[in-house]
């Protein structure tokens, strides 16, 4: 889609890490916002640059990949009414609210953007399936945004809230968004077996109108 015609832009968030084929150079970019343009740490400076660049747009979508077979979902790091509305308009059925008070100091780029912002998380990364899902979702969103429409209506949308994590050895039997039970507790797994020492993040299904901050 021509950038000028559709009024959007795309950029690589962590350019140095991308060039080196690694997640980060000094620290996780998505744990570095709002950043500091005078920092000696590359990702902290880059976070500040990206936050400033975000002022040029009406909304920001931050694209991420995961090893898990989660399909494509939205993540809302900062669940304001505007960001929830943006997620509901994006055309994806599954939406994950993942907010932390600690992230006010240093956290996700989308949480600190000066305009409505969410993440698209898609997996398994580096697969044709993930590429096709991401491409289709982004294209639909850009086309709908240009015409002032929403991609889908509210009745097709599910919301989940991340409330904790399960530590331990990886469990291949767990599937994201498939109800599981551990120690008498029922929860929906997310990013199962993604990180060392963490089995998964735990979610509850919720109503989106109960989540505004």
Region spans (language model):
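Structured catalytic-domain cores with a bias toward divalent-metal coordination
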Residues: 1-213
